[in-house]
Amino acid sequence: MVKLRLKRCGRKQRAVYRIVAIDGRSRREGRDLRKVGFYDPINNQTHLNVPAILYFLAKGAQPTGTVHDISQKAGVFTEVSLNQTKFY
């Protein structure tokens, strides 16, 4: 199963996260299928590739809780009916 989740980057004590589509069985730093955005919690910056996120959601990808919250704040799910997506 494909998941949309965070991948840690940056330096020590200064984490920046990439939002990636990745196989659910692989580890956090494993090889990703595609980068779909980034999140900087210190500066509170977010950049999302909305068409790529919608593509993976349409193919059945499951976002993690944090990625779901970030996407919801950015308004990604206003474009998709919530009846079409399942979040576990």
UniProtKB/Swiss-Prot annotation:
Primary location class: plastid
One cellular component (GO) term of this entry: ribosome
Keyword entries, A-Z: Chloroplast, Plastid, Ribonucleoprotein, Ribosomal protein
InterPro entries documented for this protein: Ribosomal_bS16, Ribosomal_bS16_CS, Ribosomal_bS16_dom_sf
Keyword Chloroplast in record: yes
Cellular compartment(s): Plastid, Chloroplast
GO aspect biological process, one term: translation
Gene3D superfamilies cross-referenced by the UniProt entry: 3.30.1320.10
Pfam families: Ribosomal_S16
GO molecular function: structural constituent of ribosome
Domain of life of the organism encoding this protein: Eukaryota
Family listed: Belongs to the bacterial ribosomal protein bS16 family.
Protein name per the record: Small ribosomal subunit protein bS16c
Gene: rps16
